């Protein structure tokens, strides 16, 4: 009886096994037949794509609004999982740091991220959100240093659970931006070792941090961001757009005799690390912007007489911006630019109304915002009369 019972159990097991096996085989065949055709290649028929939101939220902008406020604008409503702000250490900025517990040379990641995670130089912040969660406001417990380098590290999540982890550089806000204007421009040098330069004149004292020089001929990738340097009214700052040879030393402190390269001035020299020409040889639109306030403060448009239109779309766009901002008063077409006559390959321009602007600054009558300018405020100079830094 025991053998019979065991035999019955085994038969019952086999019956259940084959029943499940054939049901599985049937449904598997049905599914596979809708996906595979006779050539065994995958067919689009029978494949169903499930709908849903699988994209991480996007950061539209990160802006230092003031010394104690940073805003993060986003593409959609998010929940902040965590945010930290840290001062980027000069020691760590160009190296890699080990993870906690990691051996030397192993488990390393960028030092800026190491600092931003709050391990070092942490700046305490409190977080608010506006615009339905699409704007994050970081209120800092202490002010950032003018021109200081910081890293904002964070993790955010949208309503569908999609997350984004990011690390972004932040430059310390400058509430005391110096009031400066273009004063002399050389698009190229005919002397051996000479380079292009843009000279700035300081109308009101302050710090240069956040001031940006751009050439529409060159593009945004080559914007010149001025360093955090204190300047006084009446100072000249010569920005050399190429470094060529020895002695190209930028003068960030009080010693203004460090720069000894060809074209160095007796005033403050700043050298841009670059070996290519920057300014347009036939036409260009130069803009000077205070990025701390998103304010255009000066502009200069020039073109060879032979040109009847802007040669690149970015030139026309920059010219339009200069005009619509109220800085370049005469218009934005090629006819409204400063005209360069003759066939000379070198263009040197000098501002003629510096004395009037200086007097207005001293008397407190200089208008707020950008300085209005027209082509007649400028003149062309010869190579023998170029005077960078004076």
Residue ranges and their predicted role:
Residues 117-119, 215-225:
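Short beta-strand and strand-turn-strand segments in soluble, beta-rich domains
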Residues 37, 143-147, 228, 235-390:
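Solvent-exposed beta-edge/loop recognition patches
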Residues 41-73, 162-218, 275-283, 294, ...:
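A structural motif detector for short, solvent-exposed N-terminal "entry" segments of globular domains
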Residues 1-38:
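Sec-dependent bacterial lipoprotein signal peptides
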Residues 77-125, 211-213:
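Short, surface-exposed alpha-helix to beta-strand junction/turn motifs within ectodomains of secreted
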Residues 70-74, 78-86, 135-162, 282:
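Extracytoplasmic/surface-exposed domains of secreted proteins
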Residues 128-132, 228-233:
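Short proline/glycine- and polar residue-rich coil/turn motifs
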């Amino acid at each position: 009886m025991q053998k019979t019972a065991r035999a019955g159990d085994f038969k019952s097991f086999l019956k259940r096994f084959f029943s499940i096996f054939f049901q599985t085989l049937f449904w598997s065949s049905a599914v596979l037949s809708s996906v595979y055709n006779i050539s065994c290649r995958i067919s689009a028929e029978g494949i169903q794509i499930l709908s849903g939101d699988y994209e991480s939220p996007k950061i539209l902008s990160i802006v230092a609004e003031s010394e104690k406020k940073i805003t993060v604008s986003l593409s959609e409503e998010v929940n902040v999982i965590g945010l930290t702000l840290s001062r980027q250490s000069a020691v760590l900025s160009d190296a890699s740091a080990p993870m906690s517990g990691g051996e030397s040379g192993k488990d390393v990641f960028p030092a800026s991220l190491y600092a931003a995670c709050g391990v070092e130089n942490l700046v305490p912040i409190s977080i608010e959100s506006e615009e339905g969660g699409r704007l994050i406001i970081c209120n800092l417990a202490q002010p950032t240093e003018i021109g200081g380098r910081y890293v904002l590290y964070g993790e955010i999540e949208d309503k569908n659970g999609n997350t984004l982890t990011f690390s972004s550089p932040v430059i310390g806000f400058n509430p005391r931006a110096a009031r400066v204007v273009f004063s002399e421009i050389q698009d190229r040098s005919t002397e051996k070792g000479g380079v292009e330069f843009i000279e700035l004149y300081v109308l009101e004292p302050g710090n240069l941090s956040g001031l940006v020089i751009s050439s529409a001929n060159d593009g945004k990738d080559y914007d010149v961001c001025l360093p955090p340097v204190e300047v006084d009214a009446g100072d000249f700052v010569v920005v050399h757009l190429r470094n060529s040879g020895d002695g190209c030393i930028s003068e960030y402190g009080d010693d203004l005799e460090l720069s000894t390269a060809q074209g160095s001035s007796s005033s403050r020299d700043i050298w841009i690390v670059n070996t290519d020409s920057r300014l347009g040889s036939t036409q260009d639109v130069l803009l000077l912007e205070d990025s701390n306030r998103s304010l255009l403060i000066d502009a200069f448009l020039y073109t060879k007489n032979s040109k009847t239109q802007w040669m690149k779309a970015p030139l026309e766009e920059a010219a339009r911006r200069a005009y619509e901002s109220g800085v370049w008063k005469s218009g934005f077409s090629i006819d409204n630019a400063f005209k360069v006559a003759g066939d000379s390959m070198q263009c040197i321009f000098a501002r003629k109304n510096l004395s009037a602007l200086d007097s207005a600054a001293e008397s407190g009558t200089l208008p707020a915002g950008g300085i209005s300018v027209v082509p007649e405020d400028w003149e062309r100079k010869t190579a023998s009369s170029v005077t960078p830094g004076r």
